[in-house]
Amino acid sequence: MSNTPLPSSFDAHPEFFQETKWQKFTRRIKEEPLIPIGYAATSYALWRAYKSMKAGDSIELNRMFRARIYGHAFTLFAIVAGGIYYGQERRQRKEFEKALQQKQDQEKRDAWLKELEIRDKEDKNWRQRHAAIEMAAKEAEKKRG
């Protein structure tokens, strides 16, 4: 059997989805708060450099360009250090998410099979009723004729 998920009317069910993009974004910011600080420092340095350039202050402009480089270095350091520090936790989280995905896929498959069984049962009941009605119609026709 292939690993592709089976189609079902349960696809849009909210209990099959675990973490939204916003939840992931906030979780990642909480895990590594230094990266957004580095982004903010770099952006602030660029904004101050722009203001200095407009004012014609070349000394402040050069200071802000250096500050931008320091902000980039800080951000890069935060990314690398966070990657090293949280590497094991990320691997464990990926394993957990994989196991969770397998469980959800199995639940979807089970729900899909249950739905198919219900539909099959309804179809059999309908066929039996239709056959009974057809038999009754034939008997009624025999009695007339």
Curated annotation (Swiss-Prot):
The keyword Nuclease belongs to this UniProt entry's keyword annotation: no
Pfam families documented for this protein: HIG_1_N
Membrane spanning residue stretches: 33-50, 69-86
GO cellular component: mitochondrial membrane
Protein name: Respiratory supercomplex factor 1, mitochondrial
Record has Transcription regulation as a keyword: no
GO biological process: mitochondrial respirasome assembly
Family designation: Belongs to the RCF1 family.
Boundaries of every HIG1 domain copy: 6-97
Function: Cytochrome c oxidase subunit which plays a role in assembly of respiratory supercomplexes.
InterPro entries linked: Hypoxia_induced_domain (IPR007667), RCF1 (IPR050355)
Keywords: Coiled coil, Membrane, Mitochondrion, Transmembrane, Transmembrane helix
PROSITE patterns recorded: HIG1 (PS51503)
Signal peptide from the UniProt entry: none
Originating gene: RCF1
Self-association state and partner proteins as the record states: Associates with the respiratory chain complex III/complex IV supercomplex.
Coiled coil: 86-144
Membrane topology note: Multi-pass membrane protein
Subcellular location: Mitochondrion membrane
PANTHER family attached to this UniProt entry: HIG1 DOMAIN FAMILY MEMBER 1A (PTHR12297:SF3), HYPOXIA-INDUCBILE GENE 1 HIG1 -RELATED (PTHR12297)
